[in-house]
């Protein structure tokens, strides 16, 4: 161990506060809520605990031939580390939004889709385009391109969607990659945006926020996302409070995995 050849990790059981989970489930009309106790003081460790719990349950939502849509981000990059054999085959995994504008920014898009595809003995499909382009006209043209159109169509056919909850912040991959420009951020902030799922922004009431960014975006829309039968949202950290609350009010989540502290804040919102 002292020479670095042995690494010891402690795998403790992840437990959920059932009473708090039940209260959240009833208040927001959710199918399931799993809240992970906060057993660490670091935000990364808490995020990993939540992702580990969600990844452990993923197989229970899948069957042979399932189509699952995913969106990239820091949470989903962490989620990919905990995927194991799903006990199903012929699973199709499709990205629900285009890629960031800078490939050097680690977002976990390919990591997650490939990990689920391998674990489900299936195939991964990506949207071969940036998440946002220079104009609405270019976005409209690209959405008609054969490969991009096919990926978006497959996304609309998903039985399951898996994603993290983004908050409107300059400390996000979307902003640091240049996909969300400063003028986009200012416009969204002025229009009351509080967060996003699959790079689709919404306000505190969960309503879609129309903006220059939304018109240049290449992804499913919030209305299309809502039609997916099983939407699994994964979130951790109190900074996600307002965004998660908006996502719940908007009906973008059916199954929620979060840390207990965040769950308490949402219940008392």
What are these regions (language model features)?
Residues 68-78, 167-169, 237-239:
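Gly/Ser/Thr-rich loops at beta-strand to alpha-helix junctions
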Residues 59, 77, 81, 114-117, ...:
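A broadly conserved amphipathic alpha-helix scaffold signal in soluble, globular proteins
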Residues 1-10, 16, 99-269:
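Conserved phosphate- and dinucleotide-binding cores of soluble alpha/beta proteins
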Residues 68-69, 94, 163, 232:
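Conserved beta-strand elements of the Class I
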Residues 75-89, 173-183:
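Short Gly/Thr/Asp-enriched flexible loops that form oxyanion-binding sites at enzyme active sites
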Residues 36-38, 96, 127-129:
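Conserved beta-strand termini and adjacent loop/short-helix elements that scaffold enzyme active sites
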